[in-house]
């Protein structure tokens, strides 16, 4: 990766050294949890788990230089992505379905500018997706056809006249490129994506579009490459992009980390083995993100020992997963907000009766966010129940490579994995 900027540098000042603040007010959202995240090495990273005050106010400090999207996550599933050029962000909105519609930016010129692009998106979608379809149904001489041409010209003028600052223009360029690659209209889209991967600074990782561009790149390569073997085409596309970005650089490692995440391991085991082995053979510095990807690929296998889970407070006198002694343990990852989990709970309860009688124990790890919801959901569950109230940001879920709920790990008395399943019926069937 070439270490150069394609955008003008921010004028030097105190903000260059980070330490800017994200603050907001959420109406109808008093004394509730808020997760503040930024993109680091293309992945979302939690920087603060905080609570609103009685008026719905909260604030969080971003402790480093950052030019990209800050994401605000609420336990109900809503989120906001706000663009910053390393300067303070302040906003006001209402929690719930209108979180975007009622958004008011009080401080943050970059997001105010980006709102103009958001406002143009419906018009551009009509122009690019609706009009081409409708025009096939009319003659060029028809009045409605002429009206569509007139509207297309108006939209083109609006887009042409719009002027944006460096960071906003950059984000727009990346988003347009992603859409062009997905639509297949731009035959040079892949080459343009590669150019960004090779030349851009870390604003590419902070754009929130990095993973989308990696996916667009590999998907296009799969659809245009020679041969029918998907795994071979995946490997060829990966080798090609790593040769251009260099696997010893953070950029090359970020690309590989993304690919290891999006390519299903159960379908393409050869792909994963090749690149896990390649990473294990590197002598250069490896990003924490790639270390985790490779570590997860090798640690959660049948026969391997699961990580210990230390509880914030003792549960029934036990301080950790390892403290719970049993012939076998069933570690259940679930959540009160997960419909599939709620359907599974009655079957787990029934399974527990015989399992407990034979010296087994269940430890349920809930990926919840709201403490009240967790307590209500677990008050009648007879096993060990724990949550760190971080939902998918839970380091426990990351350590266990859990990407969906419910996920169940059956382990022996030494905490070594016997089986991983997603439904209790799979364990019942294995007994027959």
Task: Name what the model sees in each region.
Residues 1-25, 432:
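Bacterial Sec-dependent N-terminal signal peptides
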Residues 174-251:
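Charged, long alpha-helical assembly modules
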Residues 319-348, 361-363:
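Short active-site neighborhood of thiol/selenol oxidoreductases, capturing the structured segment around
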Residues 343-379, 392-398:
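Structural microenvironment flanking redox-active thiols in thiol-disulfide oxidoreductases
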Residues 146-151, 228-236, 267-271:
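Helix-turn-helix repeat elements of alpha-solenoid scaffolds
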Residues 19-200:
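A non-transmembrane, solvent-exposed segment enriched in polar/low-complexity residues
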Residues 392-432:
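Thiol/disulfide oxidoreductase modules built on the thioredoxin-like
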Residues 260-312, 322, 372, 376:
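N-proximal helix/coil linker or "cap" segments that precede and/or mark the start of modular domains
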């Amino acid at each position: 990766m070439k270490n150069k900027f394609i955008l003008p540098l921010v004028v030097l000042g105190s903000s260059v050294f980070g330490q800017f603040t994200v603050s907001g007010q959420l109406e109808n959202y008093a004394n509730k949890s808020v997760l503040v995240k930024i993109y680091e090495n293309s992945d979302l990273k939690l920087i603060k788990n905080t609570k609103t005050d009685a008026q719905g106010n909260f604030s969080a400090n971003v402790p480093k230089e950052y030019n990209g999207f800050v994401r605000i996550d609420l336990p109900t599933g809503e989120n906001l992505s706000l663009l910053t050029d390393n300067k303070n962000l302040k906003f006001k909105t209402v929690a719930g379905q209108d979180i975007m519609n009622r958004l008011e930016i009080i401080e943050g010129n970059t997001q105010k500018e980006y709102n103009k692009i958001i406002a143009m998106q419906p018009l551009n979608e009509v122009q690019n997706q609706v009009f081409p379809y409708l025009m096939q149904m009319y003659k060029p001489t028809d009045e409605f056809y002429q009206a569509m041409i007139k509207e297309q010209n108006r939209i083109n003028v609006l887009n042409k006249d719009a002027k944006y600052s460096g960071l906003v223009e950059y984000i727009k360029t990346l988003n347009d490129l992603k859409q062009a690659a997905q639509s297949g209209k731009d035959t040079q889209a892949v080459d343009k994506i590669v150019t960004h991967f090779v030349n851009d600074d870390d604003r590419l990782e902070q754009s929130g579009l990095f993973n989308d561009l990696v996916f667009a790149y590999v998907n296009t390569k799969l659809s245009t490459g020679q041969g029918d073997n998907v795994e071979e085409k995946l490997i060829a596309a990966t080798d090609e992009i790593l040769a251009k970005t260099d696997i010893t650089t953070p950029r090359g490692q970020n690309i590989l980390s993304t690919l290891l995440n999006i390519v299903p391991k159960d379908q393409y085991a050869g792909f994963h083995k090749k690149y896990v082995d390649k990473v294990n053979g590197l002598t250069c510095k490896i990003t924490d993100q790639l270390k985790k990807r490779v570590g997860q690929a090798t640690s959660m296998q049948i026969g391997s020992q699961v990580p210990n889970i230390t509880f914030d407070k003792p549960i029934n006198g036990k301080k950790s997963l390892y403290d719970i002694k049993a012939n076998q343990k069933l570690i259940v990852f679930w959540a009160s907000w997960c419909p599939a989990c709620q359907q599974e709970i009655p079957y787990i309860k029934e399974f527990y009766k015989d399992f407990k009688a034979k010296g087994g124990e269940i430890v349920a790890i809930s990926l919840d966010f709201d403490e009240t919801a967790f307590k209500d959901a677990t008050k009648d569950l007879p096993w060990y129940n724990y949550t760190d109230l971080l939902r998918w940001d839970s380091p426990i879920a990351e350590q266990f490579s859990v990407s969906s709920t419910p996920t169940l790990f059956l382990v022996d008395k030494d905490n070594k994995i016997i089986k991983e399943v997603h439904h209790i019926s799979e364990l019942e069937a294995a007994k027959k």
